[in-house]
Amino acid sequence: MIKIYAPASIGNVGVGFDVLGAAISPIDNSLLGDVITITSSKQFSLTSTGTFSNQLPKDINKNIVKKCWTYFCKILKKNLPVSITLEKNMPIGSGLGSSACSIVATVVAINTFFNKPINNFELLKLMGKLEGKISGSVHYDNVAPSYLGGMQLIINKNDIVCQKISIFKNWLWVIAWPGISISTEQARTLLPLQYSKKVCIQHSQNLAGFIHATYTHQSKLASMFMHDIIAEPYRIKLLPYFLKTKQIIIDMGAIACGISGSGPAIFAVSDNLLTAKKIATWLTNYYLTNDRGFVHICKIDTIGARKIGL
């Protein structure tokens, strides 16, 4: 039996649309991500459990886990008789890399179960391809950090998909999912096809400045560059209270705040626990819209996908 956990992630991290992603884990050591269990079987079977399993397609052939298995069968050119259980702990359309969690956990679990016939590079490319089936375009800003851990800069040149960049270990990431869902594909259609030269220059400056600040260990400087001028101005149509929420959180002492991926989850960054707890309490009281929503104080998960349990 193989049991693999893949952590949630923040796509874009505000400043790096489609090229930055960070894996996260709650500081209380709880698991925020999906779990895949694989055992030997005479034929393929898939069982879904977990808090958000009711959001999954009723047709098993539309389940991303089944699609992962199908791709593996094609790559290895043989049928793989296994029993797979998906523990769906991440809400679909949350902005926290829900589909990436399932994809990464499944691909790693199948590859591990069959003694790793596919190398890490090919695995990551497969993950990106599978993610594209759901979001409408191939991108790695969720699958890469969920798989490899840390904060990943997506390069996708030659045989290099991504590179792990330096992080600030004292940064706390307060994550809030309000309890509603937004389609990634829908959120992407809101974005313009072209941007002005001014916006492109400012975005380049922000991203370059942020990367530089992480490597030179300038925490304050890094936070100053964490502005999303590519997606946020357009996606706030789906989050009518975001700008007001963001201002309140900044006034409470957050050093940065943004939309996680396509939303509706948001993140706030703090460099001290007291402020993080205050922000978490406020978000719990005022940002969550139903009892399905949640708030977690997290740190960057530096491990990524991993075996758990036995």
From Swiss-Prot:
SUPFAM superfamilies xref list: GHMP Kinase, C-terminal domain, Ribosomal protein S5 domain 2-like
Keywords (alphabetical) are: Amino-acid biosynthesis, ATP-binding, Cytoplasm, Kinase, Nucleotide-binding, Threonine biosynthesis, Transferase
Which residues does ATP bind?
91-101
Name the GO terms of the biological process aspect.
Answer: threonine biosynthetic process
What reaction does this catalyse?
L-homoserine + ATP = O-phospho-L-homoserine + ADP + H(+)
Q: Which PROSITE patterns match?
A: GHMP_KINASES_ATP (PS00627)
Annotated compartments: Cytoplasm
| Gene Ontology CC terms, in alphabetical order | cytoplasm
EC number(s)? Answer: 2.7.1.39
User: Gene3D superfamilies recorded for this chain?
Assistant: 3.30.230.10, GHMP kinase, C-terminal domain (3.30.70.890)
Q: Which domain of life is it from?
A: Bacteria
Is Nucleotide-binding a UniProt keyword of this protein? yes
A molecular function (GO) term:
homoserine kinase activity
A Pfam family of the record is: GHMP_kinases_C
Q: Which InterPro entries match?
A: GHMP_kinase_C_dom, GHMP_kinase_C_sf, GHMP_kinase_N_dom, GHMP_knse_ATP-bd_CS, Homoserine_kinase, Ribosomal_Su5_D2-typ_SF, Ribsml_uS5_D2-typ_fold_subgr
Q: In which pathway does it act?
A: Amino-acid biosynthesis; L-threonine biosynthesis; L-threonine from L-aspartate: step 4/5
Q: Which family does it belong to?
A: Belongs to the GHMP kinase family. Homoserine kinase subfamily.
Family matches, as PANTHER family: HOMOSERINE KINASE, HOMOSERINE/4-DIPHOSPHOCYTIDYL-2-C-METHYL-D-ERYTHRITOL KINASE
Give the HAMAP family listed for this entry: Homoser_kinase (MF_00384)
* Cited function: Catalyzes the ATP-dependent phosphorylation of L-homoserine to L-homoserine phosphate.
This protein is called what?
Homoserine kinase
Organism of origin is Buchnera aphidicola subsp. Baizongia pistaciae (strain Bp)
